[in-house]
Amino acid sequence: MTKIIIFMVILVIITAAFVFKVLSRKKSYPPQSKVIDPIKITIQDIDRMEDGTGFVEYLYRLFLAMGYSDAYKTRGGRDFGPDLVFTDGEGVRNVVQAKCYSYPVGLGAVQEVYSSMRYYRAKKSMVISSNQYTSACEELAGYNAVRLHSRSDLIEIINFFKLGQIDKAKDILESEPRIVLESWDNKVIKKDFEVEKRWVAKK
């Protein structure tokens, strides 16, 4: 009889524990996604970000904190190129491609952000990277007036923002791109001459 009572008590305790666990699970809510505070983020934190999503979120929060109240993130895979869109101090819409890489950024970033300008009715485009750019990327950006913000620019923007010197941070962000004025015509002419020489030689 005593054994039966002990068994029943143990069974009740196990059942009660199971019910409590189930009810607790139902009442628990998923934790809210951590909101990035740009004032606390350093370049080292950015380097530790596992993918570009965190970097885009950081830049978005940074832009809002700098006073770009209309800044918004685009819709991932259906964004037609840019990660962010904002209006600068002159009232000009900018599209932004964010690249958090451990290696230099290539041509693709410039091609993507530049080709998205018409869709977003933007007059300016830029790429912001935690690294540097390849020479080919810099050349293409120069021909298309795409502003390339490298790691050093990003660090300056972060530092000025943390010091409360928002205007200086904005000056860097909104600075004009490096423009390549060399005409492509000369290169085309040279190429055509070479083709013509080969064609004449065959005759």
Identify the meaning behind each predicted range:
Residues M1-F80, V85-K203:
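Mixed-charge (Asp/Glu-Lys/Arg
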